[in-house]
Amino acid sequence: IEIQNIEGQTQSFKDMIASTHTDSFLVLKNGEIIFEEYFNEMNPESLHLMNSITKSFMGMLVGILADKGVFDIKEKVTKYVPELNDTGFSETTIQSALDMSAAVKFEEDYDQPLCDFWKEAAVVGWRPDLVDDNSPKTLLDFALSLKEKEQEEIEGYHYRSVLTTVLAMVIERATDERVQDLLEKHIWQKLKTEQDAVIVVDKTGLPFAGAGMNACTRDLARFGQMILNDGTYEREQIVPKEWIDSTRMGDDGYRERFAKSDHGAMFPEGHYKNQMWVANSEEMMCVGIYGQTIHINKNTGTVIVKFSSFPEPADEILFANSFILLATVSNSV
């Protein structure tokens, strides 16, 4: 396969893999592995940090629990976490948290070492240089420190990882169970996974739900295949089909909010819903900083997992070329 990159140059598949700092690349076609390669000392058993692909697991878990009647996604998060009443989350619903359309002011600019994202990451030990005696000690303490709002609820789409942390709090309060145990019971075990997954937690055991999961490449492919199959895996319905359909289709409001955002140019027909990226009606993605992606192409029956180690968290050229690579491969095999 020859691929035209974002700069207009033609590259071979092999060169594109190398230039986008790939650690592993796996292609499923109709549920079968047709390509699998590992780089940089990775192997099929290796766990890799998936960053914000973690969010997509959380989104699917919310769909499962909502279907079981644990909560209604129209409900405010403060019903379950009343401590948040006096914060920027006071009017946030489970749905607006899922869709990154909530009101809370939160800066997520990975190139700014003092932004809110890195301050939250510091709570779980990712940025020890940002920790001092006055720093929040738990993820809940951090959320309670966010008092301001940057918009009205559902006014616009703005990607903020802390909203996924709040979803984790809601899940734990509504179920009286740990998020990691629920992920294991409702998703991980049902995918017949090869390896255990690992998730980063704060001192209370609450997971860093927006970024903290680690898993092997093949197990992420299983997750992608389940989404491709409308929520089923090996004939078992894991996530309600209606949840997958609703996520994929969105509506004009979702697309308008996305088009006006910083991410709009990336996917002109796209939207973001239920912690999933949707490029168009056929292609869905789970995406994490430093180049982590699950690409799901409904039209061609392909799932591609690409783990990467970009030099910078959100390099627009590298992400653009990665998305071109994934779309080209998924439409060619």
Spans of features found by a protein language model:
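Structured C-terminal helix/loop/strand segments within mature extracytoplasmic catalytic/sensor domains
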Residues: E283-V333
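N-terminal leader/targeting segments and the immediately adjacent pre-domain N-terminus
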Residues: I1-N43, L98-D99, A103-K105, L140-S145, ...
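A short acidic/small-residue loop/turn micro-motif
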Residues: F39-N43, L47, F310-P313
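Active-site SXXK
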Residues: G31, L49-I73, A97, L167-I171, ...
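Active-site-proximal alpha-helical segments within enzyme catalytic domains
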Residues: M100, L163-V170, A211-T232, Q292-S308
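Active-site helix/loop module of the DD-peptidase/beta-lactamase fold
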Residues: L49, D67-D109, S145-E148, A174-A211, ...
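Catalytic-site signature segments of enzymes, centered on catalytic residues
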Residues: P44-E45, D109-Q112, E120-L206
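Active-site Gly/Thr loop motif
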Residues: E194-A197, R248-V303
